């Protein structure tokens, strides 16, 4: 039995009201994505998605998380920060060359791809993280990471494709349904969003599922259903300010 740590940055990041998601509904409060970790195990070959293994020998960045970029990529990142339009293309090409050389040295190891891409997520560089996650199309944690970064960048159709791929790889990894539901919500595909979020709630009973589903129902004009879901969530999460705000705002808009 292999003990692993799941990086909850990716998992928590998929909750609805963050980053590039459109805030057109009644939710004024955002849930913050924090980089925390929890321990689990992978028996019987099941991949949980978003897995990572801490390396205590890795140096930490000034931001307090582990540094997985080789020195050449760190240098290129710094150069690109102040680069003009004339040189940015050349620097990007150099970066891609060095990135591929680095990953080839480790035979495109899926864990190494995840460590590196996840670091760019922590640096809020979703475009770079996405390109690195896409280097691996076989490990669910990287497929899920690609889906989530697509969603954060507002590329919801691409996100849906990748979340669907992750679901086909492991239907029991509930966060893929949440992510796909939110991407569908962003595209106003409300019926599909409801279906995905109901599956997510049935699998996890998680707070963010109730928030997202109530918000979708409200956007559909189904105030009664929205209030019912928010109330169910409040019965389970009595201290939730966002669910209470949702319920109050739905009630003010009248329940048909």
Model-based region annotation:
Residues 111, 141, 145, 175, ...:
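Start-of-helix register in tetratricopeptide repeats
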Residues 115, 145, 179-182, 212, ...:
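Canonical tetratricopeptide repeat
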Residues 107, 137, 171, 204-205, ...:
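Short coil turns that delineate tetratricopeptide repeat
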């Amino acid at each position: 039995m292999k003990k692993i740590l799941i990086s909850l940055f990716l998992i928590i990041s998929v909750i609805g009201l963050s980053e590039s998601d459109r805030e057109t509904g009644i939710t004024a409060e955002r849930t913050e994505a924090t980089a925390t970790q929890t321990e689990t195990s992978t028996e019987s070959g099941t991949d949980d998605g978003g897995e990572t293994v801490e390396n205590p020998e890795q140096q930490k960045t000034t931001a307090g998380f582990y540094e997985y970029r080789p020195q050449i990529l760190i240098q290129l990142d710094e150069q690109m920060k102040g680069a003009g339009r004339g040189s940015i293309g050349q620097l990007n090409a150099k970066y891609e060359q060095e990135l591929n050389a680095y990953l080839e040295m480790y035979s495109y190891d899926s864990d190494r791809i995840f460590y590196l891409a996840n670091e760019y997520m922590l640096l809020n560089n979703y475009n770079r993280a996405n390109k690195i996650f896409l280097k691996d199309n076989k490990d669910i944690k990287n497929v899920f990471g690609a889906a989530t970064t697509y969603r954060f960048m507002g590329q919801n159709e691409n996100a849906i494709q990748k979340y669907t791929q992750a679901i086909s790889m492991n239907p029991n990894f509930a966060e893929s349904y949440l992510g796909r539901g939110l991407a569908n919500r962003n595209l106003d595909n409300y019926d599909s969003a409801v279906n995905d979020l109901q599956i997510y709630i049935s699998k996890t009973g998680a707070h963010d599922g109730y928030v997202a589903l109530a918000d979708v129902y409200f956007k559909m004009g189904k105030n009664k259903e929205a209030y019912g879901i928010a109330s169910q969530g409040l019965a389970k999460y009595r201290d939730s300010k966002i669910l209470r705000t949702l319920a109050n705002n739905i009630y003010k808009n009248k329940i048909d």
